[in-house]
């Protein structure tokens, strides 16, 4: 076996040496060239983002898209401004433009529903998940109104509040709170169905088995300002030593419970209620939240009157509910709401004369002067004038406008349904509800007539919280068939296509109804600011 001789080894060693020297020389030269190139590049492009763009393909931070998966929503942190209004559409919603009066004649449901003549059923088609902000622009001169739904796939869009907006900030004093858009807020609600013990079971949608939760995350953004998230501590501070009362029907109860749920997260109140009035007392701030049931807000009785027999509800439309008038000296802020009970059977009386009725008019020979929507408008004017001129009440009165229902395809008892609605209605796809529109119009007219008839100093204490149009888009916010925790309840359509019994009037909690109390807080803040200046 032969191994290499020393001579051969020395030759190989001599041959390898110059290669090492050349390799080192080349490496040093290359490194020097790299530094020279980098120095020249730095001098030529002083903006570091430009250098990053050359090496990494990133020109500006604004071009970086960071996708966040939120259920079925994909959120792009930053987007090109040209994409924001890619799907803008116009929608005119002037409720007074030749709208026919629609008077409900069907049997109203127990406790909650307002039957009405329904428009063509709406079928909401699923949009591609890579969607964008869908906007209805406001043209002030042409009278068009804006209602905009900002999809989370494009958030934050022009209608979404920036992430760094303080939750305790306040909207601008002159900003219109009621024209704006719904946007998806990944932050979610401020409470859950498990953290609020006063939540009525019918509105406990998650506790009743509703499978989706996205409806809890949509928040309202006014077009010209921010509406801050509800700040319970700020509310209790503003209302220290004072009482807020909700007066109305079961939808007023819905709003009152929402307020309690929001406040319960910072302090547990004491129940001081009675059979006549619900009252919850927050000791640390001496704040009272109260509720009075008043279906029509005016005087009602059941005794025989003229040719109207005993047992039929009679309403004296020109007299306020005496229970309200007795209680309001104790209140500092009152939120009034009504309307849905005007679909129920009742007799209307003005100046001690029967002038009309709902689902009751036996004497066909006499003309009916007042129908149910007219009666609603008169009742609003009556209660507001009475409260504004009450000698012992000087509080802030907020009229929350008519809350829309979303029974599609029929009434509550004739196959109407809101099953399967998981997102707000998109602009341009809203089916107008004639009964809701005319009820809203009559309510606003009654409010304006009351304001016109009171002294100037009293006008400032009357506020219209105009939620009707914005909440027309929230067909996703109702319990639907998830009205009870019964594990055997029917939640899907039967073989014949008929939907199960459901509630498409009240609102899930947490849910859209919490926005009403964000607005209430803002109106109270504005009132306090106005009073102090």
From Swiss-Prot:
Motif GDS motif location, chain numbering: 248-250
UniProt entry tagged with the keyword Transmembrane: yes
Function: May act as a bridging protein that binds pectin and other cell wall polysaccharides. Probably involved in maintaining esterification of pectins. May be involved in the specific O-acetylation of cell wall polymers.
Annotated gene: TBL18
Tree of life domain: Eukaryota
UniProt keyword Transmembrane, yes or no: yes
Alphabetized InterPro entries for the sequence: TBL, TBL_C, TBL_N
Bilayer disposition of the protein: Single-pass type II membrane protein
UniProt miscellaneous comment: Contains 2 motifs that are conserved in esterases, but it is unlikely that this protein belongs to the catalytically active pectin esterases.
Compartments where found: Membrane
Biased composition (Basic and acidic residues): 113-154
Membrane-spanning ranges: 21-41
Region (Disordered): 93-171, 475-502
Species per Swiss-Prot/TrEMBL record: Arabidopsis thaliana
Keyword annotations: Membrane, Signal-anchor, Transmembrane, Transmembrane helix
Protein name from the UniProt record: Protein trichome birefringence-like 18
Family the entry assigns: Belongs to the PC-esterase family. TBL subfamily.
Pfam entry (one): PMR5N
One GO cellular component term noted in the UniProt record for this chain: membrane
Motif DCXHWCLPGXXDXWN motif: positions: 503-517
A Gene Ontology molecular function term of the record: O-acetyltransferase activity
């Amino acid at each position: 076996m032969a191994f290499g001789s020393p001579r051969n080894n020395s030759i190989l060693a001599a041959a390898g040496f110059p290669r090492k020297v050349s390799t080192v020389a080349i490496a040093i030269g290359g490194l020097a060239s790299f530094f020279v190139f980098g120095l020249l590049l730095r001098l030529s492009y002083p903006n570091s983002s430009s250098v990053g763009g050359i090496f990494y393909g990133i020109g500006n931070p604004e071009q970086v898209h960071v996708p966040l998966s939120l259920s079925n929503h994909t959120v792009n942190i930053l987007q090109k401004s040209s994409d924001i209004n890619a799907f803008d559409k116009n929608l005119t919603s002037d409720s007074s433009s030749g709208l026919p009066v629609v008077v409900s004649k069907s049997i109203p449901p127990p406790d909650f529903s307002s039957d009405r003549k329904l428009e063509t059923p709406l079928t909401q088609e699923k949009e591609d998940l890579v969607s964008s902000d869908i906007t209805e622009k406001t043209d002030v001169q042409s009278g068009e109104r804006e209602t905009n739904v900002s999809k989370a796939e494009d958030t934050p869009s022009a209608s979404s509040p920036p992430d760094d907006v303080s939750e305790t900030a306040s909207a601008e004093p002159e900003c219109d709170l009621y024209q704006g858009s719904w946007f998806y807020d990944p932050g979610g609600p401020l409470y859950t169905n498990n953290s609020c013990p006063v939540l009525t079971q019918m509105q406990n949608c998650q506790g009743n088995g509703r499978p989706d939760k996205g409806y809890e995350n949509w928040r309202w953004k006014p077009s010209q300002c921010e509406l801050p998230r509800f700040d319970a501590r700020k509310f209790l501070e503003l209302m220290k030593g004072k009482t807020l009362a909700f007066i109305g029907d079961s939808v007023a109860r819905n709003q009152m419970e929402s307020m309690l749920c929001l406040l319960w997260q910072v302090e547990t109140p004491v129940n001081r209620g009675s059979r006549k009035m619900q009252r919850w007392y927050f000791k640390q701030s001496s704040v009272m939240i109260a509720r009075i049931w008043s279906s029509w807000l005016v005087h009602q009785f059941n005794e025989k009157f003229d040719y109207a027999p005993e047992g039929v509800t009679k309403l004296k439309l020109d007299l306020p509910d005496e229970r309200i008038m007795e209680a309001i000296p104790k209140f500092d802020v009152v939120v009034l709401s009504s309307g849905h009970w005007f679909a129920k059977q009742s007799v209307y009386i003005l100046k001690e004369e029967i002038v009309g009725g709902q689902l009751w008019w036996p004497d066909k020979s006499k003309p009916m002067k007042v129908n149910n929507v007219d009666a609603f408008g008169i009742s609003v004017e009556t209660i507001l004038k009475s409260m504004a001129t009450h000698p012992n009440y000087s509080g802030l009165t907020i009229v929350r406008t008519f809350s829309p229902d979303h029974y599609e395809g029929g009434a509550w008892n004739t196959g109407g349904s809101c099953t399967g609605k998981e997102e707000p209605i998109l602009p341009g796809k809203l089916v107008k509800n004639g009964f809701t529109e005319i009820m809203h119009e009559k309510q606003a007219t009654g409010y304006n007539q009351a304001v016109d008839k009171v002294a100037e100093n009293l006008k400032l204490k009357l506020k219209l919280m105009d939620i009707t149009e914005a909440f027309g888009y929230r067909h996703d916010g109702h319990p639907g068939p998830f009205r009870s925790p019964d594990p055997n309840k029917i939640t899907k359509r039967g073989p014949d296509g008929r939907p199960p019994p459901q509630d498409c009037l009240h609102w899930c909690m947490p849910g859209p109804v919490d926005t009403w109390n964000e607005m209430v807080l803002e109106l109270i803040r504005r009132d306090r600011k106005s009073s102090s200046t």
